[in-house]
Amino acid sequence: METEKMVAEKWLIAIGASGAAGLRDIGALLSTLPADLDAAVLVVLHRPSDKPSFLREVLARRSRMPVFIAEQSEILRPGRAYIGEPAAHLSLFRTNVSALITHDASTHRNRTVDLLFESLANIGGEKIIGVVLSGSLDDGSRGLASIHKANGHTMALEPDREHAQYVGMPENAIRFNGPVDFIGSVATIADEIVKLVSTRANVAIEAV
């Protein structure tokens, strides 16, 4: 049986985006990350809460790792991607990182990415990664800064000037108070994630 300490030592990757462009980016990222990545991936995408959602099915067709709808108090497993229902946002218990919980999002409209990122920041440490992909407005900026302050790793998509309506989220994250560690394309972000996770894993093995 996994203890809280064992789960806390695992990598957690949180990805936030919005709209069709954000969905495209998330699909591209999950299609690049390896199936055996030693990290749990949490995904938040702004989308209507009053319409049927096929996000899991859409992402599962592209993802190399299995995609699940997050359940209340679910233990996070590496090599899996988790999404929330449209009318909820995802966060983690500060005192028990093994539990994934959902909240009513009605009072947190357009702040679901910040809420997820900030819950990871409450855990803190070098094994948390926050990623902001395409989307409008500025959700994710504050949360990404919180992850940076908590010694986690922060990444943002390089804003695409040809699609200016979709650059708000990454552009605001880059400009916000709290430097972004890595800025690049979806492909280079995937490479950086794999490098971070594998490098830290090798260091841990050598230290044993």
Predicted regions and their residues:
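Conserved acid/base catalytic micro-environments in cytosolic active-site loops
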Residues: 1-208
